C-alpha cells in the first residue's frame, strides 16, 4: 500500500471532554503518524465552507453550528493506506453501528456528535488538508 495523508478533525464533543490524547493514541497505535496538528475554533461560516458538500442536506445548519460550538483539533495523519486506516479506526458514523474499540464506539455521544471527522478519498483529503494547512506546516 502507498503512503497517504488524510485529514482528521477531533470534533467539539470530544475536545470539550479532553479526549484529544486518547483519540491520538488510537491513531498512533494503528500505525498512523500525526504530521501536522492544531487546535482552532471555527466560525459557523468556516464550518459552512468546509462542509459545503452537505449544504443541501437537512443536517447542514446543525452540523455547522455544532462544529463552531467549541474548539476542534485539525490534524494530518500519514501512513500506509492512511485514508482507509483512519476510517477503520474511527468506526461507523453511527456509534451504535461502530465496531468495539473504535473511536466512535468508545467516545461518540450520537450520530451528530460522533467525535471525529476523516477524509473519505484521496481527492477529498487533498482539498481538506489544504483548507487547514499550508505545505510548510506538514512536517512528515
UniProtKB/Swiss-Prot annotation:
Enzyme nomenclature, EC number: 2.7.4.6
Sorted UniProt keywords: ATP-binding, Cytoplasm, Kinase, Magnesium, Metal-binding, Nucleotide metabolism, Nucleotide-binding, Phosphoprotein, Transferase
Compartment annotation: Cytoplasm
A cellular component term, taken from the record's GO annotations: cytoplasm
Pfam families attached to this UniProt entry: NDK
Quaternary structure, from the entry: Homotetramer.
Family: Belongs to the NDK family.
PROSITE patterns linked to this entry: NDPK, NDPK_LIKE
Cofactor(s) the record lists: Mg(2+)
GO MF annotations, alphabetized: ATP binding; metal ion binding; nucleoside diphosphate kinase activity
Residues annotated as the enzyme's active site: 117 (pros-phosphohistidine intermediate)
Disulfide topology: none
Chain sites annotated for binding ATP: 11, 59, 87, 93, 104, 114
Lineage: Bacteria, Pseudomonadati, Pseudomonadota, Alphaproteobacteria, Rhodobacterales
Function: Major role in the synthesis of nucleoside triphosphates other than ATP. The ATP gamma phosphate is transferred to the NDP beta phosphate via a ping-pong mechanism, using a phosphorylated active-site intermediate.
Main location, first listed in the record: cytoplasm
Entry's Gene Ontology BP terms: CTP biosynthetic process; GTP biosynthetic process; UTP biosynthetic process
Reactions this protein catalyses: a 2'-deoxyribonucleoside 5'-diphosphate + ATP = a 2'-deoxyribonucleoside 5'-triphosphate + ADP; a ribonucleoside 5'-diphosphate + ATP = a ribonucleoside 5'-triphosphate + ADP
Superkingdom, taxonomy of origin: Bacteria
Protein name according to UniProt: Nucleoside diphosphate kinase
InterPro entries with a match to the protein in the record: NDK-like_dom, NDK-like_dom_sf, Nucleoside_diP_kinase, Nucleoside_diP_kinase_AS
